[in-house]
């Protein structure tokens, strides 16, 4: 799996970086968690401050386009992001995964 960042925008108002990226892969589409781990490693950033907003795959293509946000602190991330997005990006096995609302 290769990830290429095509746009990196700093948003000082929300204390975050906004990233557009392309994921190229062989076989099945990688999971959101796999992409998030690889992207965090590429950016040298803490995993818990990286939120993948969307990943879109075109039919028959071996690549996906995505949009992610890297926050400077967790408090700001919790203020800005909607709860379902935070649950979707929860690390498997954490206490927030699978909780009933």
From Swiss-Prot:
Is the keyword Ribosomal protein in the record?
yes
Query: What highest taxon heads this organism's lineage?
Result: Archaea
Q: Does the keyword tRNA processing apply?
A: no
Q: Which UniProt keywords apply?
A: Ribonucleoprotein, Ribosomal protein
Gene Ontology MF terms in the entry:
structural constituent of ribosome
Cellular component terms per the entry's GO annotation: ribonucleoprotein complex; ribosome
Q: Which GO terms describe its biological process?
A: translation
Annotated family: Belongs to the eukaryotic ribosomal protein eS24 family.
- Know the name of this protein? Small ribosomal subunit protein eS24
Q: Which gene encodes it?
A: rps24e
